Every structure is written in structure tokens, then in C-alpha cells.
């Protein structure tokens, strides 16, 4: 729908994540440029006053060594999936796995703060529909290790944390 609206000259604020894959994102960007409209992803957590404060004070922690973030929230639709009813939240055609729905909230701040990692390794649990129900991703940077956890099939109340040498 975003492409359709941009072709009609409309600016688009697109729900996160912007696209299901890089090919789709490139096409959306191409259409936005071609039509002289703004395409913006609605990922606002890294644009909040709290995040700006975090960035402002991050150096006070010294040399940063660890980033940890967790977003695990049992989906109200998971019980239906276990009963054999596939709702949008677990439909692979809509790219609605746990990473695309919740995991992005752990990864975006990491990439905004530290950029592209040197190496990434991941593990996850696929559900009957083929989407990921949960996962863990490790990101390796020059002097920092980062781990994110995400899930739509379990709850967690672990906080996010950035550790430095101070």
C-alpha cells in the first residue's frame, strides 16, 4: 500500500519494519524519490527525549563493552495458533514473526548507537507456520558484544542494559 500511496503523490509514514526485506525497501525508496514524497518508518523509540539523553550520557560509562536488550511478550494470539487457527500475528506471508514484530525494538537502538556489527550469529524457534516464535541474536563489534532476546511465545521482564568500564 505504501507504494500505491506514494505513486499518488502522498507522503507515507510506514509501520515498522519498513519492509520485509532489502529488495522491498529499495523499491519503496525508489518510488518515494521518483514521486518526490517522503517515506518514513514509524520506528520512533530512537527519536524520543529519553533516547537522546541516553546518547548524551553514554560516554560517562567509559569504554562500552556490553549491550543487552530483551523484548519478550506472550502474544494474546498464540493460544489460537496452538489450537490450529492462524491469525495475522503468525502468518509468514505478512512477515509477522517475533523478530519483525518485537525483536526490531531491541535491534534498532543497538544499530543507532553502535552502527553495523562485524559479525552476527542467531538462533531461534520456528513455529508451525514457519515464523519465528522467539530468538536470540549476538552482535560482535570491535570492543563491544551485544545480545538481544525476543519472543512472542513467552514473557520476560529482563531490563535492557549497556555496560561500560566505569
Tell what function each PLM region has.
Residues 17, 43-46, 126, 152-154:
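Structured beta->alpha junctions
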Residues 15, 70, 163:
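Alpha/beta-hydrolase-fold catalytic nucleophile elbow
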Residues 8, 34-35, 60-64, 116, ...:
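Structured helix-beta-strand junction loops
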Residues 107-166:
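Contiguous beta-strand/loop segments that form the cofactor/metal-binding neighborhood of enzyme cores
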Residues 21, 74-79, 156-158:
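A short beta-to-alpha transition loop/helix N-cap that caps and shapes the active-site region
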Residues 1-43:
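Beta-strand-loop-alpha-helix segment that lines the small-molecule cofactor/substrate pocket
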Residues 45-120:
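Predominantly a Rossmann-like dinucleotide-binding segment in NAD(P)-dependent oxidoreductases
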